[in-house]
Amino acid sequence: MTLLLSFIALLPRIFLGFFIIHSVWNAKDGKSLLVKIFLSAGVGFGVSSLLGFLWIWGGLPLTVYAWIEIIVAILLIIWLLSQNRELWRMPQIAVKQEFLWLSFLALGALFFALNLIFYGLQYPHGRPDAWINWNVVARFIYLGGTDWQTTFLRQWDHPDYPLFVPMTNAITWVFLGSTSTWGPIALHLMLSLFVAGLFFSLVNIFRDFKQAVLAVVFFIAFPFITNQGMRQYADFLLAYLILGAGGLTLLITQTKDNRLGLLVGFLIGLGAWAKNEGLPAILGFSLLWVGLSFQQKTWKLIQHYLVGLVFPFLTLVLFKIFLAPSNDLMSVAGGAFPKLLEWERYLTILQMGWSLLWELGRRR
């Protein structure tokens, strides 16, 4: 029952995400609709965590924010559906012609969901980083009240990590009324399903239904995917956001819809809000979008991208400057920058990479 309530607690944020996506990207064909649906979790959870963080940073109670959010999200999705009746229509699939592929997809999705559930039951607290970082911070936020910032007194294991995952779990616990392990399990199970769904919908929109089924079934069949999805870390979330940003970037080259740049900028900004490793992704995507703007000879592309990026990135900058302690990796003796100039490190990487590729070639 608590697991079901955890899923219900996540739904308003998914509704909020869909509302935002559809407001920016008004394509109404079935293939685009699937992409919107499976992007909704990332956008919705991201917006919620950003606003929730700013709310509690201002000294306001998280409980009040959580209830305002659910009311607003439900009202917005009701208004959206009432104004866009075509959204009620499901994407058309020739069931008779595609019955075999649909069965293959359904069976794969069923086994994937069962694997995720069994992993969650086996490791209800996640794996080590979840115990000592992500879920601990969420407990400080939920249980700490006005003293939630004492979480930054922790001086072990990246105390400067941003708050996408902790805020999302803390808001879920507000609805559950306790720090139940089912809250994080539901979040990461939902994210794992949405990653697979987004992968399917992107292949479907760029290729076709059969190739999408084949690709996603192979994807979810890897034990690595289940493991990463349910460890309760932020790595899989970061991969999901980068996948969404990359997929929409490719879509822009086909549709020429510059407004998608707003979503790309927002998604890649959320990547940095999810984990420090998302910061290099911002640099990479920013350079890519500058290149696209030059190629298409329009600065509207980069303008839309930067507008989408500004809210999550500015929030992250404020968090890093005024709240987060110094990064434990960057503050070690000697610093990180001098190590970047040690050519022996690059030689070791090249040697190991060559050895790995050589072995793969021999096995073929």
Per-segment meaning from a language model:
Residues 1-94:
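Membrane-embedded, hydrophobic transmembrane alpha-helices
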Residues 31-37, 179-182, 199-221:
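Transmembrane-helix signature of polytopic, membrane-embedded enzymes
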Residues 74-86, 183-206:
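Transmembrane-helix motifs of polytopic, lipid-linked glycan transferases
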Residues 113, 123, 284, 291-364:
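Membrane-lumen/periplasm interface segments of specific transmembrane helices
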Residues 123-137, 143-168, 178-179, 328-330:
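Extracytoplasmic catalytic/substrate-binding loops of multi-pass membrane glycan-assembly enzymes
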Residues 215, 260-276, 282-287:
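Membrane-interface alpha helices of multi-pass inner-membrane proteins
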Residues 230-237:
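Short acidic/glycine- and proline-prone juxtamembrane loop motifs at membrane-interface regions
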Residues 245-260:
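Membrane-interface transmembrane helices that cradle and orient dolichyl/undecaprenyl
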